[in-house]
Design a protein with these regions (language model features):
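Terminal alpha-helical anchor/extension segments at protein ends
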Residues: 1-127
Length: 127
C-alpha cells in the first residue's frame, strides 16, 4: 500500500515525471512535475567502459542527476515515502546514487518503462 502524499517517480532514459499519491486509501496519482536532462558540460556519470555510447552516457548522467534531486528532496524532509518506477537500466543507474536516507524512505521499486503510461496504469504497476 502506498501512503497518502507518497512521492512516485516514473523515469526512463531522458525523462521523468513526479507524482503525489492524493488518495487517503489506495493509489490516485496527481502529476506534479516533468523533468528532463540538465545539459551540464562539466558533470558526467563518471568513468564508463569504452563501448559506452554518448546516448548511454547521457542516460546515466540523467539517472544520476535524478537520484541526486530525490536525495535532496528526502534530506529536506519533502518526502515521507517514495516509489520509483523506471526502466531497468535507469533504475540500476539511480540505485548507485541513492543516499542512505532515501533508501529508508523507499517503499517500492518497479523495473518497467511507464513514462508514457496513464496514472491508472502506473497505479496498477505499483499495486
Amino acid at each position: 500500500m502506498l501512503s497518502h502524499n507518497a512521492l512516485v517517480v516514473v523515469a526512463a532514459g531522458h525523462q521523468a515525471v513526479l507524482f503525489r499519491n492524493t488518495a487517503k486509501q489506495g493509489i490516485e496519482l496527481e502529476e506534479k512535475e516533468r523533468l528532463s536532462p540538465k545539459h551540464l558540460q562539466d558533470e558526467s556519470q563518471g568513468k564508463q567502459p569504452e563501448e559506452t555510447t554518448p546516448k548511454d552516457e547521457d542516460e546515466a548522467t540523467f539517472a544520476k542527476q535524478l537520484a541526486e534531486r530525490l536525495n535532496r528532496m528526502v534530506l529536506q524532509n519533502k518526502v515521507e515515502a517514495l516509489a520509483v518506477v523506471a526502466d531497468p537500466s535507469t533504475l540500476g543507474q539511480m540505485r548507485r546514487h541513492y543516499h542512505k536516507t532515501l533508501e529508508q524512505k523507499l517503499v517500492r521499486e518497479v523495473a518497467k518503462t511507464l513514462t508514457s503510461a496513464s496514472g491508472a496504469e502506473i497505479a496498477k504497476a505499483l499495486g
